[in-house]
């Protein structure tokens, strides 16, 4: 897929050493092209999102209120990607996109198979009443970019969305899956891309509605808090500052 605008210049940093001031969402970057865009879209909800790596120690995820798994060029059907399965057992809500969606399905007994690649807009049809789709219409456009698909679900999961690409008479099954009891969710599509009409609403449903994050984070507050940290750390010391290409 292609976002219609670039992510904000600010990149997500690793978790701060001090106790977090704001509720946080971890975005695990599997090498897909949109991990930082996911973090940007969550921050636009005034929720702090931070990029983590798949091989980060499980302790690095302490204190997060939820986890988002990004897409990846790897194939879930080939067991690529290097996700530490312990992450999927964290006692917080988890939402996967594309590759991340397939990893969620696999972890809980689902099956993933290689399929004909889908790329471009598709029509999403929502079913059921999962909170992940609260306020989202029954039909909307989403952005697809994948070569694997979830063909079977494990116990506790249900299909809450199917999709259809132009010219295809057969719906794509399991385009969205949910286990509301365990707070595990997956989207085969990319809600973070602007082509997904109600993607930001879906992200809000997850970060604020399901994870319970308070929307307290802003860029202005971030700058103020970081300046205060630097002043405290550098008090009475010389400072060596690198800027831009430095």
Give names to the regions the model predicted.
Residues 81-97, 102-200:
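Pocket-forming structural segment of enzyme catalytic cores
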Residues 16, 22-27, 32-102, 108, ...:
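Flexible gly/pro-rich beta->alpha loop and the following alpha-helix that scaffold active-site loops
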Residues 30, 71-72, 145-147, 189, ...:
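Fold-independent oxyanion-binding glycine-rich loops
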